[in-house]
Amino acid sequence: MSFLLPKLTSKKEVDQAIKSTAEKVLVLRFGRDEDPVCLQLDDILSKTSADLSKMAAIYLVDVDHTPVYTQYFDISYIPSTVFFFNGQHMKVDYGSPDHTKFVGSFKTKQDFIDLIEVIYRGAMRGKLIVQSPIDPKNVPKYDLLYQDI
């Protein structure tokens, strides 16, 4: 299903998407097209993109083509999903140590829809960090890996 979503293949394209997406949540899925977990997430993203079109713009970003952002967001596990609103990086408290990105795939379409709605409402009120509406049992668990320390 990843062929249904637009792809950003360079740092310039990612920069342009961040700068030009206004009054919507920008969803950037970092990963690889052939990865099975990325394909699972892409299926959820593509099935919800039409329903969320007034609130969110969803793009796929290949980690191999954008090493600057892969390093900047410390993408050690794929897929990782990062959110922006009007050029501002939106953080979400998932009950995990990392609030900058969602790592892994969402369990259900509704989890993703709920998260986008919460980010959108919070961003419209000027918040830069919001509380995740996703049940903690549905948030993938992982250990933070600090590189080059």
Curated annotation (Swiss-Prot):
Gene3D superfamilies on file: Glutaredoxin
Pfam families in the record: DIM1
Superkingdom as given in the UniProt entry: Eukaryota
Keyword field: Cell cycle, mRNA processing, mRNA splicing, Nucleus
GO CC annotations on file: cytosol; nucleoplasm; nucleus; U4/U6 x U5 tri-snRNP complex
Example GO BP: positive regulation of cell population proliferation
InterPro entries in UniProt: Dim1, Thioredoxin-like_sf
Chief location category: nucleus
Record's subcellular location: Nucleus
S-S bonds: none
Similarity field: Belongs to the DIM1 family.
Assembly mode: Homodimer. Interacts with the U5-102 kDa protein subunit of the spliceosome.
Stated role: Essential role in pre-mRNA splicing. Required in cell cycle progression for S/G(2) transition.
Protein's UniProt name: Thioredoxin-like protein 4B
Organism, as annotated: Mus musculus
Lineage: Eukaryota, Metazoa, Chordata, Craniata, Vertebrata
Gene name of the record: Txnl4b
